[in-house]
Amino acid sequence: MHTIETASKGAPCRSCMRSFVARKKVTIPATIEATAMSYIDGFVIAVPNANREQFIAHARTFDAIFVEFGAIRVVECWGDDVPDGKVTDFRRAVQAKQDESVVFSWVEWPDKAARDAGMAKFMQDPRMEAAADCPFDGKRMIFGGFKSVVSLPD
């Protein structure tokens, strides 16, 4: 077992020196079976604030297709507390403009094989033609596939 210390807003975090208040110790297993964990597709995009509702409608449409093709879960998060960093940050990563918000999203799949099959179907689906009316600049989207190595609580 490992014991880690978690923090929530208030006292300074040792690594980033941001302010954190409460610290709590959590015990987790020493080994975690990565093979039994899901596969994640992660995305970060800049969306014009004026397009927020259009983005939500767009996401609901396309996220339902991901689920239809095997995704376990899809999460879309509109930036709320996205600070500027000293070296880099989410806004710089997607070249967000003043009138844009950063959206952080992920698609969770049972495993990489399910993801590969689901994404292949997704890209071939005729409903993808509607993506041409995307409410954000897709050229600035960053994305990637990730193997889950820690998932709590499980």
Tell me the role of every PLM-derived stretch:
Residues M1-A11, V26-I32:
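Ser/Thr-rich, low-complexity intrinsically disordered segments
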Residues A57-F62, G118-D125:
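Short amphipathic alpha-helices in soluble, non-transmembrane regions
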Residues Q54-V67, V102-V107:
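Generic detector of contiguous secondary-structure segments
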Residues A22-T35, V67, A71-Q98, Q124-D154:
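Glycine-rich beta-strand-turn "strand-cap" elements at beta-sheet edges
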Residues E33-T61:
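Long, hydrophobic N-terminal alpha-helical segment
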Residues C13-C16:
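Cysteine-centered motifs
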Residues I40-V47, K86-F122:
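Short, well-ordered beta-strand segments in beta-rich or mixed alpha/beta enzyme
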